A protein has these predicted regions:
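Alpha-helical scaffolds flanking conserved acidic
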Residues: 1, 72-76, 235, 335-340, ...
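Post-HEXXH active-site segment of zinc metalloproteases
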Residues: 21-23, 336, 340, 352-381
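Short alpha-helical catalytic segment bearing the HExxH-like zincin motif
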Residues: 4, 230, 337-346
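Structured, active/binding-site neighborhoods that engage oxygen-rich ligands
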Residues: 1-277
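Catalytic glutamate of the conserved HExxH
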Residues: 8-9, 341, 345-353
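Short pre-active-site segment immediately N-terminal to the catalytic Zn-binding motif
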Residues: 324-341
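Auxiliary, metal-adjacent structural segments of Zn-dependent hydrolase domains
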Residues: 274-326
């Protein structure tokens, strides 16, 4: 997710140059394009800016965190951004097609690359490939119900899935070529010299994947993606989303990009990566279980810090703390096989009482002892 946002912001100024050249019926020269390959040139310029790529990536991430509907979140985030007026470069914040979709009730049939630049939270969050591809499809067809777009997001999600599972580049390339029908045998210098601006998914997503395959590290991937020109912010966002999961992101790059990310997106990034950390924690402890995660989610409430109200049967999270911080409330796994967790002080064992068919009676003096008793009975029943 953050890799996509970094690519978007780093590529934003270069995309403006490409668009301006296109309007004048000229092109950015090869020499100008490849300047970004010089590491003395900063990835981020003073006029760098987040764009729709970052906004909609955040929308997908927030939708996952809230178990929402992709269409609803994409529209809400899009409409909120449109209300801000023109972007930093004096342009509309979204393309005409996307704005038209925002203002209609129909399914969009775009074949553009906008679906692929926003998709990275899905393959990062979900574990099983079948589920990843299904979620990818659902997130795509809301606005991009076209075979070229569907195939493009499948390719990006597959690349991220394989990258995060430590597959080698050769295998990633082979899988995408076989399953998505892409020819990834480009020549980098040829792209830098001759690639033309297009937002078509079929003519930009393969190039973005290729730039990742040609890279040596995360920053190199972003620089090479920008160096081919065209829709530079989106290509770099797609490349960055794959590169993040293959290489990781250097801390100095993370620090440098912070001033360019709006606070609400920073908040989503923080919560999304904390959730990923929590999922990894459960897997490492060999207790990853969808039912357990659902239990944590459905029994968690946010409470104001100044309230004296009790929430029986729930975990309690103060103010804007995030769900994943439940790990701090549940530091000890008492029985890994049965997912017994030390939660009596927070849940009052209400759910266990309900499962066992006992009436719930609050007894502050004995609640912990009663909770332990109920947990033992619950485990025996399991």
């Amino acid at each position: 997710m953050l890799g996509a946002i970094i690519g978007d912001i780093a590529g934003s100024t270069y995309e403006v140059k490409e668009v301006n050249a296109l309007k004048k019926n000229t092109k950015v020269s090869y020499e100008e394009r490849v300047k970004i390959l010089d590491k003395r040139v900063s990835l981020f310029q003073k006029d760098s800016s987040y764009t729709d790529d970052s906004v909609l990536t955040a929308a997908i991430a927030e939708c996952i965190l809230k178990s929402g509907d992709y269409k609803d979140y994409l529209k809400t985030f899009g409409q909120n951004e449109v209300m801000l007026g023109m972007d930093k470069y004096g342009r509309s914040r979204f393309g005409k097609g996307f704005i038209s979709w925002l203002n209609s009730d129909t399914i969009g049939e775009s074949y553009g690359n906008g679906c692929a630049m926003r998709i990275s939270p899905i393959p990062m969050y979900f574990s099983e490939l079948d589920e990843i591809l299904n979620e990818t499809y659902q997130a795509t067809i809301t606005s991009h119900n076209h075979n070229d777009a569907i195939n493009a997001t499948k390719a990006v999600s597959l690349a991220i899935f394989m990258a995060k599972n430590h597959c080698c580049k050769e295998n990633i390339k082979q899988a995408i070529e076989e399953q998505c029908g892409y020819d990834l045998n480009f020549n980098l210098k040829d792209l830098q010299q001759n690639y033309k601006f297009t937002s078509k998914a079929k003519d930009s997503v393969p190039q973005a994947i290729f730039c990742f395959l040609e890279s040596d590290d995360f920053e190199d991937a972003i620089r090479k993606a920008i160096s081919i020109g065209g829709d530079a912010d989106t290509i770099a966002a797609i490349t960055g989303s794959i590169a993040e999961n293959y290489y990781g992101i250097p801390q100095d790059v993370i620090r440098m990009v912070q001033p360019f990310i709006p606070e609400y997106i920073k908040n989503i990034i923080t919560r999304f990566y904390l959730k990923l950390e929590f999922l990894d924690f459960l897997k490492q402890e060999n207790i990853y279980d969808e039912k357990f995660l659902k239990y944590l989610k459905t029994r968690t409430v946010t409470t104001p810090s100044n309230t004296d109200k009790s929430w029986f049967g729930c975990f309690s999270i103060v103010d804007n703390e995030v769900l994943v911080d439940i790990k701090l409330l549940v530091p000890e796994i008492e029985n890994k096989d049965n997912l017994l967790v030390n939660i009596h002080e927070y849940t009052h064992a209400y759910d266990l009482y309900q499962l066992l068919g006992y009436p719930y009676i609050e007894d502050k003096m004995n609640k912990e002892a009663r909770a332990k008793e109920m947990e033992k009975k619950y485990l025996l029943r399991k």
